[in-house]
UniProtKB/Swiss-Prot annotation:
Lineage: Bacteria, Pseudomonadati, Pseudomonadota, Alphaproteobacteria, Acetobacterales
The protein's name in its UniProt record: High-potential iron-sulfur protein
UniProt-listed InterPro entries: High_potential_FeS_prot, HIPIP_sf
Organism: Rhodopila globiformis
Gene Ontology BP annotations: aerobic electron transport chain
Subunit and interaction comment: Homodimer.
Family that this chain belongs to: Belongs to the high-potential iron-sulfur protein (HiPIP) family.
Amino acid sequence: QDKIDPKMVQYQDSPKDGNKCSTCVNFEAPSSCKIVAGKISPNGWCIAYAPMEDKKG
């Protein structure tokens, strides 16, 4: 499946409201994303941001 152009999801290289790629379920370290194309910063953000579940339970 083709990944989405970063412009389509309003990708930015900086966090938004404390949310960032490194805490998103779609982020794949060190610098890629399951759904957004291209090099992705761990400190970036886009409208597809989905926070990881807190594992502390």
